Amino acid sequence: MKQKTSTAMRLRALVLSVLLTMPLWVLAQISGVVVDAEDGGPVPYATVQYKGNRISAVADGNGRFRIERHNGWRLTISSVGYREQVVNVNPKTPAQFTVRLSSENRTLSEVTVKSKKKSRYSRKDNPAVELMRKVIANKKKSDLKSHDYYRYQSYQKIGLSLNDLKPETLEKGIFKRYPWLREQVETSQYTDKLTLPLTVDEMVTEQLWRKDPKAERTIVKGTKSSGVNDLFQTGEILTTVMRETFADVDIYDDYILLMRHKFSSPIGRDAIQFYRYYITDTVYVGADRCIQLDFLPNNQQDYGFRGQIYIIADTSYQVKRCELYIPRSSDVNWVESMQCMQEFSKQENGEWLLTIDDMIVELMLTDFIQKGVVTRTTRKTDFSFDPLPDSRFKKKNPLQIEPGSDSRSEAFWQEHRQVEFTKSEAGMSGFLTHLEQLKGFKYVIFGLKALIENYLETGTREKPSKFDVGPINTFISQNFYDGLRFRVGGQTTANLNPHLFAKGYMAYGTRHHEKYYNAELTYAIAPKQYLPQEFPVNNIIFSSKRDVALPSDKYGINDKDNVFASFKVHEIDKMFLYNTQRLAYEFETSTHWRFSGDLKTERIDPIGSLELKPVALDAAPLSKMRYTESTFGIRYAPDEKFINTKQRRRTTNKDAWYVQLQHTIGYHGLLGGEYAYNYTELEWFRRTWLPMSWGKIDTRLRLGKQWNQVPWPLLPMPQANLSYIVHPQLFNMINNIEFLNDRFASLMLTWEMGGKIFNRIPLLRKLKLREILEFKALWGSLSERNNPYLQQNQSSTLLMNFPTNSYIMDGKKPYFEYAIGVQNILSLIQIEYVRRLNYLDLPTATKHGIRFTITPTF
């Protein structure tokens, strides 16, 4: 009896287990039926597959199929004679649905008929153009910012892989020696090519919006990175640059910033003039009947897309699906192909909003370097338009990073990951371990770090570097006083102390056997991850320096000892030996306000033909002069974003405008200071993108005034570029200390046209050259109180005679120069012809010049 009871209980438990797990099994499956879009009849034996993931199924004779559910993957349904259809599987994809396939023959026939027409494209009485006008007119219906509030969650995965590996390659060389490397290779679900994933990065954010008062917030809830970028301390630069370069696309914007270029949107305000449109078919996208509209730019080398837009076939004129491609003849560098696929989903309130945004960019630097592919997938979910409490907007920083966002648990990622990892992506950690065990691999990484980061690390991934040696490109340089110059330096990192940082160098000049040094100690009030300049700064800095430099070196962005910038276009025989001690405080807010203040005492000794000669006839030249000053500055750059290199912090979004104001006060008698003065300077920068792919114009304005009587070393000097390297923010044809003013205004305009003209010249079109024009102007004047040549100033105890070949500008005659250049020579080189327009009668004036730089960019 007991045995029968026990058997019955086991049977009931088994049945209960099956019943409980059956819903989970059903939810993990997708089933459907494939039908002909025209007559609704079943399409038998259609192929249903996740391309690149080796999971597939075949529909039965009635068109019915069943396949595993993999959220974030692309399900492709195809059959002979029909156009394949792709379904982006996500949590909202129903467990059962109908797939309607359009006949390939009918569509091809229509396209063939159209292609045979030789008639000129016309916008007048063109139904495709009229349809697009209605789509553009109804754009506001999908504008999230028309709501008083919104919130949604965004998941993004971005990866970098080696691309287009050949099957024969996997059977020889390193792949044959290391089977684990061959196992890392997979087939891309987007391109069907063999790829080797190298990095994969994830980010989960919450997007918030309030219309009144206007506020927008991005809250980073989780980030995760794995792959070869973990081998580099600055590896997050790769992730940041990829996110900036291959950013999310919003076709409802007028222009789309992608790969450092602005592309005209196919539904932007200038789209009708920029693109050609053709209605090609009526198809089903999912369950929605859509009008397929193909488009391409008038000139396919302009920065525009070709592709298809699928518009809901009703009076809403909303976009259901969009496929964007960069034409093969496009002017973009190193991109073999780019495709961006977007899908819009109907929300409960009836709006069509972007929920799926995938981008695949195949890269090719040269024929002999392995190709790469960047894959970026974005999913937007959980849209809500309910009012948000003011507390969600209390913090003013538009980008907020939750504590612990970079160390979320696996449970967090299982909950928020909208796109499943492939086998190779999931095994990235083991792949990295295998790589590090390769013989000689650590030496390869050491060399790559030196090349990429310009510093030599003294640690490993297991024991991170506490001290980095560099910059490498300053180890050897030259100048007229030192001759050949040797320098060695380095800096501590947060691995030694996250608050206290030291950096500096020792240098030696071979001609006069002079020794120099620079030592800097920084206390970061907020702990840093690696270096003290990480945003936002809240630092106290003390530095001491003894070194030679040109007066204009303070305006340069690069280190003055950069070996490439140490060769000058003019003969240099005037320098100063600086002996400087400085105490500074720098503070940045999360809203990108920057406040700074310092106290500096500096002694300068003239070198070469430079003299510090007072105007009094009986006065002897001075061997030195000392001044003590404080500089207080404020800077605002609300849209700036950064990456942290080991040398400096760099702005990633060059479109960000800024304005800064600083005032300097000189103290007589403080720390040996011999002069009292006030100097004010204002700088403003803005980038303007021109419509219709006419490029961009950078505008830079600077104003400055010295309010007191001072010797000439304390007067503002023109920002002169004395090297052969292009510097857009410096004057190319002004010599060392050529003009001395006590008030000035400078305007610099740079117009990068992006090949707009060259692309229309048949012989130049294939070279993908790009035009650049520059115009620079300087207005300056010298007040009577600072003019050493006036009789009334001959008894001054402050003024000094100007150096040889230094001049006073005519206040009614601004200085002008321009440059005409060619960018993108061999996809790397920029060469400019620079021309000085006036003040040519001065003995040191040079009328013409050539400048160059290497600027790798898309």
Model-derived features with residue positions:
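Structural motif
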Residues: 29-43
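Short, acidic, small-residue-rich periplasmic hinge/interaction motif at the N-terminus
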Residues: 35, 47-49, 79-80, 97-144
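Short Pro-Gly-centered beta-turn/loop motif in secreted/extracellular proteins
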Residues: 40-44, 66-73
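Hydrophobic beta-strand segments
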Residues: 46-50, 75, 113, 152, ...
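A short, solvent-exposed loop/turn motif at the edges and junctions
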Residues: 50-51, 74-87
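Short, acidic Ser/Thr/Gly-rich low-complexity loop/linker segments typical of extracellular
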Residues: 54-64
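Exposed, low-structure sequence patches enriched in small/polar residues
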Residues: 261-263, 395-858
